[in-house]
Design a protein with these regions (language model features):
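An aromatic/glycine/proline-enriched structural segment found at the starts
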Residues: 191, 195-199, 212-216, 233-234, ...
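M16 family metallopeptidases and their MPP-like homologs
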Residues: 46, 51-67, 73-77, 89-190, ...
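Positively charged n-region of N-terminal signal peptides that target proteins for export
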Residues: 1-7
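Boundary at the C-terminal end of the N-terminal hydrophobic targeting segment
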Residues: 20-22, 27
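Short acidic-hydrophobic surface loop/beta-edge motif
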Residues: 33-38, 314-318
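Active-site His/Glu-centered metal-binding helix of metallohydrolases
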Residues: 74-82, 345
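Bacterial N-terminal signal peptides
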Residues: 9-19
Length: 383
């Protein structure tokens, strides 16, 4: 959570109209209101009344590093499912839909148990189980109101609705008119309190296609995946955020809901809001809506430490594509005193056309079309 607060504070600083060096830091701090609710949710508000709008950013302190074994891609899948609605949003009759979704899970479990058999799998039985599963999906689909969550946001002036998943965290964001703040609190608290895994297997197919496009069919994507798999042994950064194809094909809506209940907790989340907002008026609204989410202890941090690397590791792909080169060095986590040093080194070496890498490789030697570097790839939470 300390890392999340640092990132969110940086976001708030960037929201100011003048460069940070021109600001009175003490004055800035007076404009920031921060409170932790009784259930553990941390809320940060920066009042910026120049326009009657606000933006928010919700950070969940979990990412693909928390993906369970044999269920890689689950954190990213949960990000997709967060837009599918709740028990109130996205359904014509949730009581009936809930029964139908339970049938989907029941038939999928039977189908998957037969599919993964190593010995004695019955093709005819598998085909019948698959049909029963698909029929159950079709029955549940009758209750779905497609994209209702997004339509509510957009029809009330919301823009920029987006989300992302990294190894370390998951983020959600969009902007709305300031007079829609209570609507925002209602729907955002609802999606983190009452998620429904509707259209799960259809969305899983979307993610599988995303993997095929960005990794399996992309020379660069395949190289980066193998690069990380070679660079790390024990650290969960060696697994792809989008997940392995075989895992995507296997995990269930029940798995996703279990992941949600384990990691999407108030104590594991921070919400930052910037805009034409009065903290004294807004905080009671947030407490009324988000405070209803039950409190649970913050999840236990991963403790696995990457063993020292004592020799060079290389991976090479022979592909009919433009040459692409990646080189990496292990670094400590963000808790290390030298964390800022790595950012400074990266800035000097690879930030823009005046950086040393760009000048040497692109401008002077003309051996590269582009050159870039990152101090926090693939993550900085674990080492």
């Amino acid at each position: 959570m300390k890392r999340c607060f640092a990132k969110l504070s940086a976001l708030l600083l960037l929201a100011l109209t003048l460069p940070l060096t021109a600001q009175d830091l003490a004055s800035f701090e007076k404009r920031v209101t921060m409170k932790t609710l009784p259930n553990g949710l941390t809320v940060i508000i920066l009042r910026r009344p120049e326009a009657p709008v606000f933006s928010f950013f919700t950070m969940v302190d979990t990412g693909s590093a928390q993906d369970p074994l044999s269920k890689t891609g689950l954190a990213h899948m949960m990000e997709h499912m967060a837009f599918k609605g709740t028990s109130d949003i996205g359904t014509t009759d949730y009581a009936e839909e809930k029964v139908a979704l339970a049938k989907v899970e029941e038939t999928y479990a039977a189908y998957e148990a037969e599919r993964i058999k190593r010995v004695g799998r019955d093709p005819q039985k598998l085909a019948q189980l698959q049909k029963e599963w698909q029929d159950a999906i079709a029955a549940a689909d009758k209750f779905v109101v497609k994209n209702q969550f997004g339509e509510i946001v957009e029809s009330h002036g919301g823009v920029g609705m987006n989300a992302f998943t990294t190894y370390d965290e998951t983020g959600y964001m969009y902007s709305m008119p300031s007079n829609m703040i209570e609507l925002w609190a209602a729907i955002e608290s609802d999606r983190f309190a009452n998620p429904v895994m509707r259209d799960f297997y259809k969305e899983r197919n979307v993610v599988m296609e995303e993997r095929r496009m960005r990794t399996d069919s992309s020379p660069t994507g395949r190289l980066v995946e193998q690069f990380l798999g070679t660079a790390f042994d024990a650290n969960p950064y060696h697994r792809p955020t989008i997940g392995y194809a075989s895992d995507l094909q296997a995990f269930s809506a029940t798995d996703a809901l279990n992941f949600f209940h384990q990691y999407y907790l108030p104590s594991n989340m921070v919400i930052a809001l910037v805009g034409d907002l009065d903290p004294d008026q807004l905080m009671p609204i947030i407490e009324r809506y988000f405070g209803q989410i039950p409190a649970k202890p913050k999840p236990t941090e991963l403790t696995t430490v990457e063993p020292p690397q004592n020799s060079v590791r290389e991976v090479k792909l022979n592909d009919p594509a433009q040459p692409f080169y990646v080189e990496g060095y292990h670094r400590p986590s963000y808790l290390d005193p030298d964390d800022a040093v790595y950012d400074a080194i990266t800035d000097i070496l690879s930030n823009g056309r005046t950086s040393r890498m760009y000048r040497a490789l692109v401008r002077d030697q003309k051996i590269a079309a582009a050159a870039a570097g990152f101090s926090g790839f693939p993550g900085t939470k674990y080492q």
